């Protein structure tokens, strides 16, 4: 394998896809360190309001403006436009994440969904193998609240009922802005949506180190109600089998440009 950014990213783009989520054994992953750092542009510092919505199955964030954050670098060829952020969780602190790293489960998992800028929209991108890029953060429940989540948690309190929404600022995403994530290692693989229609169109990027969230903060997420006015207890898809020849790459990142 040639040691160049283009050859490596092209090889990742040609990896065989699988259904998602999956259980990942880090010791079995090929380890690469020559990728360009991931670059997150305009996520919490663009002074644009967003909408936080309880859509009956999850808490869902999107920006009101057509000016969207951009993700580039790492395993991605080209730029990917931010579409939405959402959460997966369960009733306990160990089965609320969708991906498992070395068998470890966490309280929740947050997905930042992007579509390839060469396609006109999210809907158009879903029909292509390189259509989407999803960045996943595992959320670990701890006793003390994480002040970085305060703005977002305030929104959770306002959207307890299904189809309720509230306007929030881009600062609601500022919990991403930490040294751990700027230099965080991650795994990447070609996979699918974890919700219907489960299309295999996603380049997954899952950070290895979990993000801490207070148990009380997490409790507000678990109080969100579905259409039947009953709390959403679980919105996690079970892990799927790796097909023969499927690869997951461990990336030792030098420094992300957040």
Each language-model region and where it sits:
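Alpha-carbonic anhydrase
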Residues: 1-258
């Amino acid at each position: 394998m040639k040691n160049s950014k283009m050859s490596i990213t092209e090889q990742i783009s040609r990896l065989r896809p699988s259904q998602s989520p999956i259980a990942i054994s880090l010791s079995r992953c090929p380890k690469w360190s020559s990728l360009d750092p991931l670059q997150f542009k305009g996520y919490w510092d663009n002074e644009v309001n967003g909408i936080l919505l309880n859509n009956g199955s999850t808490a869902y964030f999107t920006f009101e403006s057509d000016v969207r954050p951009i993700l580039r670098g790492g395993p991605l060829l080209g730029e990917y436009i931010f579409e939405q952020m959402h959460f997966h969780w369960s009733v306990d602190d160990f089965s609320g994440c969708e991906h498992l790293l070395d068998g470890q489960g966490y309280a929740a998992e947050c997905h930042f969904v992007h579509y390839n800028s060469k396609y006109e929209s999210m809907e158009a991108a879903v029909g292509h193998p390189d259509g989407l890029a999803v960045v996943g953060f595992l959320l670990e429940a701890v006793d003390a609240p994480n002040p970085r989540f305060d703005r977002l948690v305030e929104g959770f309190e306002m959207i307890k009922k299904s189809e309720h929404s509230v306007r929030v600022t881009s600062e609601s995403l500022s919990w991403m802005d930490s040294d751990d994530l700027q230099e965080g290692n991650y795994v990447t693989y070609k996979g699918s949506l974890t919700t219907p229609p489960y299309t295999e169109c996603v380049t997954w990027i899952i950070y290895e180190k979990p993000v801490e969230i207070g148990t009380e903060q997490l409790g507000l997420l678990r109080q969100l109600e579905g259409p039947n006015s009953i709390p959403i207890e679980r919105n996690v898809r079970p892990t799927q089998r790796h097909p023969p020849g499927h690869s997951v790459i461990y990336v030792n990142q030098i420094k992300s440009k957040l």
